[in-house]
């Protein structure tokens, strides 16, 4: 009986470790592809006299004329996520590009001690996707090839573009 319990515990731990490794590998592959294909950012900004006054002032303070355009940014986030009506701890990494508007957001949301939901949102080549798996193994969401999701992912990209002045 002890042997069966040991084997079951080993299999569960192995599945969790393998799920994490496969999930991270996929996310890292997407990031490598985005890093290699950032496209060409705009050479120059719009003339400041064509912008509304508050926007022109913002750009004057944040974007000196000799500054090169931002091509990509990597963000790390820690916080809480509203899941099933209660807030729970989460960590995330996000990689965003500007030449070809794209992002990947890879999060771990705590379900219970030692048990996370892995979530990956992407916006690449005009298409959004959302994938989530418990412990990186059991799928709980897999959404893609959806015009509403594409639109939502683009809106998120534009909303987060302030990180890339």
Q: What annotation goes with each model-predicted range?
A:
Residues 1-16:
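N-terminal Sec-pathway targeting helices
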Residues 14-93:
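N-terminal cleavable signal peptides for secretion/export
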Residues 28, 84, 116, 145-146:
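Detector for Asparagine
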Residues 47-54, 80-84, 105-109, 153-164:
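Short linear motifs at secondary-structure transitions and domain/linker junctions
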Residues 57-136:
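N-terminal mature ectodomain segment of secretory-pathway/periplasmic proteins
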Residues 131-165:
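Flexible, processing/modification-adjacent segments and terminal tails
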């Amino acid at each position: 009986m002890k042997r069966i319990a040991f084997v079951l515990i080993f299999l569960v731990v192995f599945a969790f470790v393998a799920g994490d490794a496969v999930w991270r590998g996929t996310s890292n592959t997407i990031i490598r592809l985005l890093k290699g294909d950032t496209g060409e950012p705009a050479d120059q900004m719009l003339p400041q006299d064509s912008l509304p006054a508050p926007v022109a002032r913002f750009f004057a303070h944040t974007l000196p004329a000799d500054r090169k355009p931002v091509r990509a940014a990597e963000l790390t986030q820690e916080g809480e996520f509203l899941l099933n009506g209660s807030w729970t701890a989460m960590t995330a990494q996000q990689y965003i590009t500007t030449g070809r508007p794209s992002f990947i957001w890879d999060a771990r949301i705590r379900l219970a001690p030692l048990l996370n939901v892995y979530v990956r949102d992407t916006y690449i080549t005009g298409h959004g996707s959302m994938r989530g798996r418990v412990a990186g193994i059991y799928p709980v969401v897999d959404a893609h090839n959806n015009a509403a999701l594409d639109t939502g992912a683009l809106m998120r990209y534009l909303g987060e573009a302030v990180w890339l002045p």
